[in-house]
């Protein structure tokens, strides 16, 4: 995201909304993580929605749960806003892990759900709400190909410098064993 320098000054952590005249049902809702500029006076922003926080590594335990349960636990633990969460009803294998990102666990649970009931699910942020959808419910009557209006693309690689995890200190209670 970029904009021409003017009286608007954005800082890291500022809320970024991309809407079409409707503050309740916009296109993007997130925060700025990086602000940069140069002599051209074009300000560049790196912005993320709340799924950026799903890269947080933590202790995750889930027994007899579903993909929906895992997403609910992540949202509760990371204080993320939940939206529509469709439940596949498939019990995923037990998770008992630490120092693995929430998003990695969810990706594995999506794979397990694809293998089990053979249904593909996706997790996405819909204007500030984490949603879990069965891909069948997201189909659109749209075809991208030779006869479409898609005429080009670009891509970039990054591992998002200066990203830090929280530090948890855990110790054994000597009196209770």
What is each PLM-predicted segment?
Residues 51, 86-89:
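Short, histidine-centered active-site or binding-site loop motifs used for metal coordination
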Residues 37, 89, 137-139:
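Residue-level detector of flexible, active-site-proximal loop/helix-junction positions
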Residues 43, 93-94, 128:
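Generic beta-strand structural signal
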Residues 57-59, 92-93:
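Short, contiguous strand/loop micro-motifs
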Residues 111, 119-177:
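Acidic, small/polar-enriched beta strand-loop surface segments
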Residues 1, 47, 59-83, 97-124, ...:
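Amphipathic, non-transmembrane alpha-helical segments in extracytoplasmic/periplasmic proteins
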Residues 88-96:
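Surface-exposed aromatic
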Residues 1-53, 57, 145-152:
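Assembly/oligomerization scaffold segments
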């Amino acid at each position: 995201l970029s904009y021409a320098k003017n009286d608007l000054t954005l800082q890291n952590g500022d809320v970024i909304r991309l809407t079409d005249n409707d503050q309740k049902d916009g296109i993007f809702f997130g925060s700025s993580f990086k602000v940069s500029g140069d002599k051209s006076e074009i300000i560049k922003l790196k912005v993320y929605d709340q799924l950026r926080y799903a890269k947080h590594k933590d202790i995750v335990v889930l027994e007899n749960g579903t993909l929906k349960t895992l997403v609910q636990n992540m949202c509760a633990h990371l204080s993320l806003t939940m939206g529509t969460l469709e439940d596949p009803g498939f019990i995923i294998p037990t998770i008992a892990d630490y120092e693995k990102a929430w998003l990695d666990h969810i990706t594995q649970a999506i794979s397990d759900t694809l293998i089990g009931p053979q249904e593909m699910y996706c997790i996405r942020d819909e204007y500030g709400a984490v949603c879990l959808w069965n891909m069948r419910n997201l189909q659109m009557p749209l075809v991208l190909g030779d006869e479409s209006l898609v005429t080009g693309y670009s891509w970039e690689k990054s591992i998002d410098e200066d990203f830090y995890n929280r530090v948890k200190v855990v110790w054994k209670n000597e009196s209770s064993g």
